[in-house]
């Protein structure tokens, strides 16, 4: 262990008395709990920062590994890669000086930022879902807005229904007239000319007694 690494170890042990763990002479592990309020996350996992220092440290960037104490849906491979890039950039800026504390701090801050972003996305998704549900409920009370196209389609259906009703009414009246007709000639005239009740009486094809009998 070089003097620079030994000095780094002493610094880390004083800053992280419970979180620091020395894997070997050149490999350190620091477990940092993530605060619920700072991250806006109900059950955030702890950030595990592992670094391996070469004999050239601090003039050479350490090999860093970032993991978490347990899986979390907001902290996948994409987010871990983002953390590694931020740490690597900070390490380049700190070359020539003790940097592990700085790298750990940057990793924790970026983890909080990621969790806050994910929390905001989830909140927006929930609000959007509630908004759409509210719109669907409002449609039940306000109905569908009428357009030229929708009215034309409705009118077409209504006209077809109305024509069918008129046809049924005419057929019903025809059956009644046939039943009231006094002779086969009268029934024939009804079928050929579709005569009305008034015309049947005027032409003496239906007797008043027949109609009253039907009633």
Curated annotation (Swiss-Prot):
Gene Ontology biological-process annotations: cytoplasmic translation
Superkingdom per UniProt: Eukaryota
InterPro entries registered for this protein in UniProt: GIR2-like (IPR040213), RWD_dom (IPR006575), UBQ-conjugating_enzyme/RWD (IPR016135)
Record-annotated RWD domain positions: 7-114
Keywords, alphabetical: Cytoplasm, Nucleus
Any GO CC annotation of this UniProt entry: nucleus
Annotated Pfam families: RWD
Localisation: Cytoplasm; Nucleus
Designated name of the protein: RWD domain-containing protein C1393.09c
Native source organism of the sequence: Schizosaccharomyces pombe (strain 972 / ATCC 24843)
